[in-house]
């Protein structure tokens, strides 16, 4: 337990190229936590976080091109990765073996996300569709069509009701998952939406854009509830803290910022990376943040809780 923000651990040369994505899960059996990273070096790496340090568990080979997105199942020891090779791969975190490879088709799979029940994997495509794959079947179950541009980012709401997508032209779409209907189209940004994240109570959606702004939306009414500035360049990633009170952002200005949801203010900035920071995530209880970037490093920070 700590009462201030500080950098706790640095893994230098974690990959041989830029690290574009990170996920954080917990291993209940071993009382340890798992960090998964995806890099332009074509590798997915699985790290164990225990005793305040990272140990490399598996280096997963299979992708033919850079890995752009990783996620960890909420229910099983499985990770998913998507790559510029247009394949999604599922990995067993307990033995480091590939479970299956899914051909995402001629349109690149970009960001991917497990559904809250982890039975599905959603991924955005170049043609404005969100494709939903069955984790068990490995097949495309259905698509949601934004009728828009290349989808860079997607997120499920934790309550399983909504799926949000962010496109290269700054348009955000929110779908009702049960009906497949498009509920809201939000036009708050004029530049690519790199990342979006729902609050744990599914009431708010936070969006990150190349315009340098972070926006907070009230999901139910699609109202803009806040515009936050502070990053000096593109905002590349946002992730909510499990306690609903804070979220974290990362940017090509090389910084990681922690924001207070209630006051809409930045409460801490980390300047520890040497290059743009592509990915940030909280751990399960919100006591730690992980960040990854073009400097090939993984950083773990302590948060006051």
Curated annotation (Swiss-Prot):
Keywords: Acetylation, Cytoplasm, Nucleus, Repeat, Transcription, Transcription regulation, WD repeat, Wnt signaling pathway. Its main location: nucleus. WD repeats lie at residues 14-57, 62-101, 104-143, 146-187, 188-227, 230-269, 272-305. The modification N-acetylmethionine is found at residue 1. It is found in: Nucleus; Cytoplasm. One of its GO terms (biological process) is transcription elongation by RNA polymerase II. Component of the PAF1 complex (PAF1C) which has multiple functions during transcription by RNA polymerase II and is implicated in regulation of development and maintenance of embryonic stem cell pluripotency. PAF1C associates with RNA polymerase II through interaction with POLR2A CTD non-phosphorylated and 'Ser-2'- and 'Ser-5'-phosphorylated forms and is involved in transcriptional elongation, acting both independently and synergistically with TCEA1 and in cooperation with the DSIF complex and HTATSF1. PAF1C is required for transcription of Hox and Wnt target genes. Belongs to the SKI8 family. Component of the PAF1 complex, which consists of CDC73, PAF1, LEO1, CTR9, RTF1 and SKIC8. The PAF1 complex interacts with PHF5A. Within the PAF1 complex interacts directly with PHF5A. Component of the SKI complex which consists of SKIC2, SKIC3 and SKIC8. This is Superkiller complex protein 8.
């Amino acid at each position: 337990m700590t009462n201030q923000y500080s950098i706790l651990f640095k893994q230098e040369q974690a990959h041989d190229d830029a690290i574009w994505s990170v996920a954080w899960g917990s291993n209940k059996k071993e009382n340890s936590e798992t960090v998964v990273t995806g890099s332009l070096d074509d590798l997915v790496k699985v790290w164990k976080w225990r005793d305040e340090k990272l140990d490399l568990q598996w280096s997963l080979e299979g992708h033919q091109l850079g890995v752009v997105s990783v996620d960890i199942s909420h229910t099983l020891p499985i990770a998913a990765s998507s790559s510029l090779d247009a394949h999604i791969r599922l990995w067993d975190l307990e033995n480091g073996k590939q479970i299956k490879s899914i051909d995402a088709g001629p349109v690149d799979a970009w960001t991917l996300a497990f559904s809250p029940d982890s039975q599905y994997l959603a991924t955005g495509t170049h043609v404005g569709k969100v494709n939903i794959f069955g984790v068990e079947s490995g097949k495309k179950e259905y698509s949601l069509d934004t009728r828009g541009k290349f989808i860079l980012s997607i997120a499920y709401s934790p309550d399983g009701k909504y799926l949000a997508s962010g496109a290269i032209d700054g348009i955000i779409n929110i779908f009702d998952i049960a009906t497949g209907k498009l509920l809201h189209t939000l036009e708050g940004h004029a530049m690519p939406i790199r990342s979006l994240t729902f609050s744990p109570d599914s009431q708010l959606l936070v969006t990150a854009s190349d315009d340098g702004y972070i926006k907070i939306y009230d999901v139910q009414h699609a109202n803009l509830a806040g515009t936050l500035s502070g990053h000096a360049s593109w905002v590349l990633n946002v992730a909510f803290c499990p306690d609903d009170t804070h979220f974290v952002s990362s940017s090509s200005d090389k910084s990681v910022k922690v924001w207070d949801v209630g006051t809409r203010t930045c409460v801490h900035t980390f300047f520890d990376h040497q290059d743009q920071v592509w990915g940030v995530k909280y751990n399960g209880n919100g006591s730690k943040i992980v960040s990854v970037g073009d400097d090939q490093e993984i950083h773990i920070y302590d948060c006051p809780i």
